[in-house]
Each structure stands twice: as C-alpha cells, then as structure tokens.
Amino acid sequence: MTKKIEEKIGGVIESLGYLLYDVSLVKENEQHVLRVSLKNPNGAVSLDICQQVSEIISPLLDVCDFIQDAYILEVSSMGLERTLKTPKHFKLSLGEKVEVKLTNKESFQAVLKDANDLSADFELEDHAIKSVEYKDLKKVKTLFEW
C-alpha cells in the first residue's frame, strides 16, 4: 500500500521542489499513522514546508482512499541520523558520512559516494573505495557530525 501512496504523492512533492524520502504506515496506540518524510535539495525541511506539503497531499490521499481506516498524517524531514533501507535512501544520501555494518560482522565508517539498484560505494578514511552489495549490508546509518 505504501508503494501506491509513494507513486501518488511523489510527483506532487517533487513539483513543489522537494523529494519524497520515505512513506510508512504504522499503528501506534490503536491509531494508524501515515509518516511521509521529505528531503529538501536546497537546504533544511522547515515546519512551513511540512505544513505546505501536508495541506497539499492530505486531500489527495483522502480522494484516493488508499487507507480505509482513520489515520493521522505526519510530514517531516528525513532526519539527520537515519537508517538507510532501500536503494532510494542510499541515492538520496550521497556524500553523507555513514556507519556501515556488514553481515560478516565487519563494520566501518565512510562517506557514501555512489549507489545503484544493487550496491553502494563507500569512500574509506584512506580514500579507498569499497563497493558492497545491499545483500551484504546488515545496517547502514547516517552520522551527523557536530
């Protein structure tokens, strides 16, 4: 269902100058919550941007009726530190510092340099490039440096 929602609202969000990072539908305290997270290629995602996007996509979601039950719509930034789960997440996080944990228990910190549908390339501290297929990644998390 979230894939259909992404397809419906992704173009609308892009027409406003932002990028759709993720859509998730969760149940919290017996209430369905639809979370839409954004990336602003020109800077931060402000509260005004979240409100603007929410006001535009809310009626669209109501008309499409993808979610049968009542739900709360939450629109937010993708966050400074987040787990990368899909090729899209990797592509939208190029140039960021990440902590990488592999399925073979190896771990390292690097800069995410490239990503495609099968793998991601990481630049290590010695400037070497390490290419890893997604299937070999256990967890990749962006790191925010103060």
From Swiss-Prot:
Keyword annotations of the record: Cytoplasm, Ribosome biogenesis
Cellular localisation: Cytoplasm
Pfam families: DUF150_C, RimP_N
A GO CC term attached to the entry: cytosol
Superkingdom of origin: Bacteria
GO BP term (any one): ribosomal small subunit assembly
Annotated InterPro entries: Ribosome_maturation_RimP (IPR003728), RimP_C (IPR028998), RimP_N (IPR028989), RimP_N_sf (IPR035956)
Membrane-spanning ranges: none
Function statement: Required for maturation of 30S ribosomal subunits.
Entry similarity comment: Belongs to the RimP family.
PANTHER family: RIBOSOME MATURATION FACTOR RIMP
Designated name of the protein: Ribosome maturation factor RimP
Gene name of the record: rimP
